[in-house]
UniProtKB/Swiss-Prot annotation:
GO terms for cellular component: chromosome, telomeric region; mitochondrion; nucleus; site of double-strand break; Smc5-Smc6 complex. A motif (Nuclear localization signal) lies at residues 35-39. Belongs to the SMC family. SMC6 subfamily. Its main location: nucleus. This is Structural maintenance of chromosomes protein 6. GO terms for molecular function: ATP binding; ATP hydrolysis activity; damaged DNA binding; single-stranded DNA binding. Residues 530-695 are annotated as: Flexible hinge. SUPFAM superfamilies: P-loop containing nucleoside triphosphate hydrolases. It comes from the Eukaryota. PANTHER family: STRUCTURAL MAINTENANCE OF CHROMOSOMES 5,6 SMC5, SMC6, STRUCTURAL MAINTENANCE OF CHROMOSOMES PROTEIN 6.
Length: 1114
């Protein structure tokens, strides 16, 4: 048949092939459906709801099931659900395993715990592309940072009814997918015992299709973005589109339209087929008339044979050169194998050397531990000696104070005795007089009053001592704070002086050796595949007008400002070596990243507030995109007032993760989620440029010095107020104490006077005793003073003894610290060697794999060389069949294939011309006749087959279109009924209205407070969220997918609606045996809703490690 094409249309052959293929597919499907109806008599995914398997007969009727205990009955789930998920080095998971239930599963955990990574792993493991997960454009982006590969293992149940090839796979089907950084991803389909059945993706797709798991259906596996898009669809057209895609109605419509287009195109081409058939018939009739023989001239045939031989010998020469090139390629690959082998040998030698050195270091550590213990023992002994000397010193001091107190008391007694003696001497000349009984009563009253005064005096003494202690504590606190602020001010003044002298201190803000590090990188830049870039803070500048946000922005992205960027792991290792050689002590992050420029405008924060991107200038666009990747700066907004920022975040603005607010020059606020507020302290050193680095933070340092000076004065004033208050209290207590002592003195004097008058006799005995007592007191004072001088000498002696002990204490402490530092250094050294050994082992495995690939390539090329040589020999034999190579060289023939082809065409035309002039032989006429007849009969048969196939296709399309309309009505009806049932949970009513003309889906809700149903867009936030959740469940109802998943369905719900929504999900999905449902949420489901069902499984993820430095509520 002659190939005919029409401008603007597909070739007829392609249309015919598609038509026949479609017809054959239809017939196969009908035959399969007939076989299925004969074998099972059930519909896909719902086939086991009406009947239950019986152990003996294979089925048990529904009436038998009805007799079972309805309280304990739980419908058995069919095969195909995911039993276990195992992840290795996938996204944030290093080694993770999770067992899932056959029905409803909740995966709960805090943000950052890796919940969404589980859903991503399931979709990727079942054959989805990376772009379908909204987690990256390439599968390699999903490999855990620092790792060469990631592995996803899914265990599918195959033990129940509806199993897939159970005789081959057993009770489990294991799907394994491996992602590599330096190679393509691979699949593996294994049986229950781990035996690999297939490694082809199409076989895994066959299993997935068998269990009816539409991985590519966006409504089957709703990621965070997909769930957000569906649950917040703003227009009725969006809702209609989501519903039609999820229930596959849209795909069916597109397939029917495509089949109709094929049918119409085939009908148009039938006329061309008929014309071709007529042309074949004419050729067939002409062939009958040919009777003459054709003779060919011998010269033309000879020339044609030589040309064909020359063409074959040229091919032999070309293939011989190609064989030599392949052999040269083998030599090159073998050289690479030798290089990789040398690298493996070097790594193994390093591993042996580090292992040997590690044993030596461990021995040094053991010796150093003993040495540290000895130094610690010496230090403890010195401490004990110092403590004993201090105890003696304090004891002698106490004795000295006691002696001084006794001296003061003795002198007071001497003064009192002098007065008494003077009074007695005066009384000797007087007569004793007065009422002694009255004086005794007055004496008793004075003794009681004196006792009360003594108690008051003791209380005031204690209070006075307490207030003095408080005054001393306040003074100590004041000195400590003043000393800290003064030291900070002095440091900043020194930094300002360095800047004024022209010393560039900007790089020292990252590390004191940063300038040395940059010089070393510049000197060794040829060793890098791509020179390292950093620190990133030196490539960023605060725009004019945003200077007040400098510290707040630096605090928000501080982890990225210190970082350096390298392009591959090799440069990463080289950069770490350079850092160690330059003595970098700061924590410098190293980011392995290939700089690129991309459009992130769709991810920018929505609102009238500026973002960090608006406040920064970057040295080049690639650096800007790097900060977007590292710190999400396009989603951090700048709002001065924290209350305004909180109100803005509570409105859930699009693409906003955090807001920064100002507080003072030393601290600020970071807000996220509308409810969380962290108070952060700014760093003193500036690690990004301000106004093109014109001042390098000079003005900020001056402002900070001025502020700290004011703060210093404020501290002085504050403590002065405290001290004034304490001293006022001290003065008051001291005045009361003096008054009390005066009262006691007067009382004692009067009591002494009364006692003397009561016991007075006219004699000199009392006077003499007082004189003797005064003499004894004076002698005691003299002895106390001598003891005091002796104690002073002892104290000086103890102080002299303490000096060498203090020096010994300091020296032992210093030796202990040095020994501990050396021990720590040895431990860090051995840890570093262990990490290097592990790295070299990983490198060895990597190079072994690389060597294996090289060797396999050599084997493949050797096979190709052998095949090529064998082909060359066959070509030589074919060429020799025409003529020898020597004969070709002696004949004047063209040297290129193009020239040979042109001359062959010319010779062939001359032969054809001769044939036309001379006619054909009888055999040739017969051959031509047979050929034309066969072509005509074949064309006629194919025309009839196509015509019949078109008729069958037309009838099938009409039947399929009618079935689609019925299915569409049934699907919409099921969704509407399920939606209505979900609304009853909150005592609402309503319906789904599908409008085909405008392709829109309207949702009408009648709440308990409404008289008339309203559109869902007019509802409150909670009611709207509940309605959207009911719509999602209604969409799932007719989907009949074996597995469905939803990520963070409650992200826009408050606590009340979250509880209602969760209760609705549990009620609707917990008893559905044909579908395994996976719900991911950051909320604790156990606290939100009461869940007590064997059909519900809750899996709690481990919380991520993070710190909260907020002091907002302190």
């Amino acid at each position: 048949m002659i190939s005919t094409t029409i401008s603007g249309k597909r070739p007829i052959e392609q249309v015919d092939d598609e038509l026949l293929s479609l017809t054959a597919q239809q017939e196969n499907e009908e035959q399969q459906q007939q076989r299925k109806r004969r074998r099972h008599q059930f519909a896909p995914m719902t086939q086991f709801n009406s009947n239950t398997l019986d152990e003996d007969s294979g089925f048990r009727s529904s009436s038998d099931v009805a007799t079972a205990d309805q309280d304990n009955f739980l419908e058995e789930s069919p095969s195909g659900y995911i039993k276990k998920v195992i992840l290795r080095n996938f996204m944030c998971h290093e080694h993770f395993e999770l067992e899932l239930g056959s029905r409803l599963n909740f995966i709960v955990g805090n943000n950052g715990s890796g919940k969404s990574a589980i859903l991503t792993a399931i979709t990727i493991g079942l054959g989805a592309k990376a772009s379908e997960t909204n987690r990256g454009s390439s599968l390699k982006d999903l490999i855990r940072e620092g790792c060469y590969s990631a592995k996803i293992i899914l265990h599918l149940d195959n033990s129940k009814y509806g199993a897939y090839q159970q005789g081959i796979f057993g009770n489990e089907i294991i799907v394994e997918r491996i992602i590599k950084r330096d190679g393509p991803a691979s699949f593996s389909l294994r049986s229950e015992n781990g035996k690999e059945i297939s490694n082809k993706k199409k076989d895994i797709q066959t299993v997935v299709d068998y269990f009816s798991v539409p991985v590519s259906n966006p409504m089957c596996f709703l990621s965070q973005d997909a769930a957000r898009s569906f649950l917040t669809a703003s227009t009725s057209q969006d809702k209609y589109s989501h519903f039609m895609k999820g229930t596959l109605l849209q795909e069916i419509t597109e397939n029917l339209l495509y089949a109709s287009a094929i049918h119409d195109s085939a009908q148009e081409n039938m006329a061309l087929h008929l014309e071709n058939l007529k042309s074949l018939k004419a050729e067939y009739e002409d062939a009958k008339k040919l009777l003459r023989e054709l003779n060919q001239t011998s010269d033309l045939n000879e020339r044609k044979m030589l040309l064909q031989a020359k063409s074959l010998w040229i091919d032999v020469a070309h293939n011989t050169d190609a064989c030599k090139n392949l052999e040269n390629e083998i030599s090159g690959i073998q050289q690479k194998v030798d290089e990789v082998t040398e690298k493996i040998r070097n790594r193994q030698e390093k591993i042996e050397r580090y292992t040997s050195d590690g044993t030596t270091i461990e021995a040094q550590i053991d010796a150093k531990v003993i040495y540290v213990n000895e130094k610690d023992s010496e230090h403890q002994n010195a401490r004990e000696l110092l403590r004993d000397v201090k105890s003696r010193f304090e004891k002698e001091k106490s004795n000295q104070a006691e002696a001084q107190s006794n001296i003061d008391q003795g002198r007071k007694k001497v003064d009192a005795l002098n007065k008494t003696i003077a009074h007695l001497e005066e009384e000797l000349t007087k007569e004793m007089g007065g009422d002694k009984d009255q004086m005794r009563q007055e004496l008793e009253q004075l003794e009681k009053a004196n006792e009360k005064l003594r108690e008051v005096n003791n209380s005031l003494v204690v209070s006075l001592q307490d207030v003095k202690n408080e005054e001393r504590d306040i003074q100590h606190e004041r000195e400590s704070e003043l000393r800290t602020i003064s030291r900070s001010i002095q440091n900043k003044k020194v930094e300002l002086q360095n800047i004024a002298k022209g010393n560039d201190t900007f790089l020292m803000n990252f590390d004191r050796n940063m300038d040395r590090l940059l010089r070393t990188i510049e000197q060794r830049k040829n060793e890098f595949e791509t020179p390292a870039i950093g620190p990133l803070g030196s490539l960023v500048t605060i725009r004019k007008g945003f200077e007040k946000w400098t510290r707040s922005i630096q605090r928000a992205i501080s982890s990225s400002l210190n970082a350096f960027v390298v392009s591959n792991p090799k440069d990463n290792r080289l950069f770490r070596d350079i850092m160690r050689s330059c003595g970098i002590r700061s924590n410098i992050p190293i980011v392995t990243y290939c700089l690129s420029q991309f459009d992130y405008s769709k991810g920018r924060a929505h609102g009238n507030y500026p973002t960090i991107v608006d406040a920064l200038e970057f040295s080049k666009p690639e650096i800007e995109c790097l900060f977007v990747d590292l710190s999400r700066i396009e989603r951090i907004v700048l709002i001065e007032d924290k209350n305004e920022a909180r109100n803005f975040l509570q409105r859930n603005p699009v693409n906003v993760n955090m807001a920064l607010s100002l507080r003072d020059r030393r601290s600020g606020f970071q807000l996220s989620g509308g409810y969380r507020l962290d108070t952060v302290t700014y760093q003193d050193k500036i690690r990004l440029k301000v106004n093109s680095s014109s001042d390098n933070g000079t003005q900020y340092l001056k402002d900070l010095i001025e502020q700290e000076t004011k703060e210093l004065q404020n501290i002085r004033d504050r403590y002065e107020e405290k001290l004034s208050e304490v001293r006022s209290r001290l003065k008051e207590i001291d005045g009361r104490l003096k008054s009390t002592k005066n009262e006691m003195r007067k009382t004692n004097f009067r009591m002494t006077e009364l006692k003397m008058n009561v016991g007075k006799v006219v004699d000199t005995g009392i006077l003499n005793s007082k004189i003797n007592e005064r003499k004894n007191q004076e002698q005691a004072i003299a002895s106390y003073e001598a003891a005091k001088e002796e104690l002073g000498l002892k104290i000086e002696q103890i102080a002299q003894e303490a000096q060498p002990i203090k020096e010994q204490y300091d020296s032992t402490k210093l030796a202990l610290v040095e020994a501990q530092d050396e021990l720590q250094q040895l431990k860090e050294d051995i840890n570093s060697r262990q990490s290097k050994i592990q790295k070299y082992k990983d490198d060895t495995i990597y190079y072994e794999d690389k060597k294996k690939v090289y060797l396999e390539n050599i084997k493949k090329i050797e096979v190709n060389v052998a095949a090529l040589k064998e082909g060359i020999q066959r070509q030589i034999q074919n060429a020799c069949a025409f003529c020898s190579k020597e004969r070709i060289e002696n004949v004047d023939l063209p040297d290129t294939q193009e020239e040979i082809k042109r001359e062959l065409d010319k010779v062939s035309r001359m032969i054809q011309k001769a044939e036309k002039s001379l006619g054909l032989s009888q055999e040739e006429v017969i051959a031509l006749f047979e050929k034309c007849r066969n072509k005509y009969k074949e064309g006629q048969k194919k025309y009839m087959e196509i015509d019949e196939a078109l008729n069958r296709l037309h009838n099938s399309l009409k039947a399929r279109d009618q079935n689609y309309k019925n299915a569409e009505k049934g699907t919409c009806f099921d969704a509407d009924m399920d939606f209505r049932a979900s609304l009853k949970v909150r005592k609402f009513s309503g319906n789904l209205s599908f409008i085909k003309d405008t392709k829109s889906l309207e949702i009408y809700i009648l709440t308990t407070n409404d008289e008339k149903a309203r559109n869902v867009d007019t509802l409150s936030g909670g009611e709207k969220s509940f309605s959207q959740m009911a719509l999602l469940l209604a969409t799932w109802k007719p989907m009949r997918s074996r597995i469905i998943a939803l990520d963070e369905f409650d992200v826009f719900m408050d606590q009340v609606n979250r509880k209602i929504g969760t209760t609705l999900i549990v009620k609707k999905l917990k008893d559905i045996a044909r579908t395994q449902t996976i719900i991911i949420t950051p909320q604790d489901i156990g606290k939100i809703a009461d869940i007590d069902s064997s059909g519900v499984s809750i899996h709690r993820m481990r919380d991520p490690e993070r710190q909260n430095n907020s002091n907002f509520y302190n």
